[in-house]
A protein has these predicted regions:
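Single conserved hydrophobic/aromatic residue that forms the stacking wall/gate
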Residues: 1-7, 11-12
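A C-terminal functional module that forms or caps the active site or interfaces directly
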Residues: 176, 180-227, 231-238
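Conserved anion-binding
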Residues: 71-175
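Active-site beta-loop-alpha junctions enriched in small/polar residues
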Residues: 36-38, 68-72, 105-107, 132-136, ...
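N-terminal active-site wall of soluble small-molecule enzyme domains
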Residues: 27-29, 33-95, 185
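Hydrophobic faces of well-ordered beta-strands that scaffold small-molecule active sites
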Residues: 31-33, 63-65, 102-104, 127-131, ...
Length: 273
């Protein structure tokens, strides 16, 4: 019975995801599914994650797998292959989750990052390395001073170094995660990593606003991908959209309105800087 219930839950979640993608794909460049929200349901949840990745690719969206992997050696290589690469069994080649980017934890150093960089070079895909995360306690480690400099800045320098090994046309395949809730640090890190895309979580539900984000972008207005999760997928719960007639039944319409508001907020802030 429990397996049937989980299967039904994943079927509902799959339809929910598709409805939001259908309502927003023409407005956005990328999506960032968080794998833990699927893994908690076991095999059925992982299958729903894969369906979401595949459907987003059908809509020509870049898929950033929010997986935060971090290990060393063959294990790190297996993570990199599973999310971004291909595995060969006998004469056949298979892809795993097949995201375009994956988030990676740098705590284990180069031993944990190099296997991902190798796969990025081979597959022309990318990673976002956790540098300064949006959560309140991130400073417990990330703000610690080493020879007078914060750890997040030193990690940013390593991101730039690793990224120099695998450049695309204008940006590296190695990007960074820097939270919208720390705009001053974002300004510093943008200068440290001028050729890296910055993935910016923390917009919306965590308090980030367009005016906080301008320094995450380069002078040409490019180089950052701003992420809003709950603010979009649960927009129908917000009073501002309820006042516009949004209900749980038309949740996808509320998500579209939230995306439009987000675009206007960020574009307006960039125009005024």
């Amino acid at each position: 019975i429990s397996a049937c219930l989980v299967g039904s839950e994943m079927c509902i979640r799959d339809r929910y995801n598709k409805a939001i993608v259908d309502a927003t794909y023409d407005l956005i460049p990328a999506v960032k599914p968080q794998i833990a929200m699927y893994e908690q349901f076991g095999v059925a949840g992982v299958a729903a994650f894969q369906k979401t990745v595949d459907y987003c690719h059908e809509k020509d969206l870049v898929v950033i797998g929010d997986v935060k992997r971090g290990d060393i050696g063959s294990t790190s290589a297996a993570y990199a292959t599973g999310h971004l690469g291909k595995v060969q069994i006998a004469s056949k080649t298979y892809t795993g989750f097949n995201e375009d980017f994956a988030t990676v934890n740098p705590y284990l150093g180069t031993d944990g990052i190099k296997p991902f960089v190798d796969v990025c070079k081979e597959e022309k895909k990318g990673i976002f390395i956790l540098v300064k995360t949006s959560n309140p306690s991130s400073g417990e480690f990330q703000d610690r001073l080493i020879d007078g400099r914060p750890l997040y800045e030193l990690v940013g320098e390593k991101v730039a170094e690793w990224g120099s090994e695998c450049m695309g046309d204008s940006y590296s395949y190695v990007g960074a995660v820097v939270g919208a809730t720390y705009p001053e640090q974002g300004e510093i890190l943008r200068k440290v990593m001028p050729k890296s895309f910055i993935l910016v979580p923390g917009y919306g539900a965590q308090g980030g606003q367009g005016k906080d984000l301008v320094h995450f972008f380069n002078e040409d207005g490019l180089g950052a991908i701003v992420n809003s999760s709950r603010g979009i997928i649960c927009a129908y719960k917000q009073d501002k959209y309820k006042e516009q007639g949004m209900t749980p039944e038309n949740f996808a319409d509320a998500s579209r309105l939230a995306v439009k508001d987000m675009i206007a907020d960020i574009s307006g802030a960039l125009a005024q800087r």
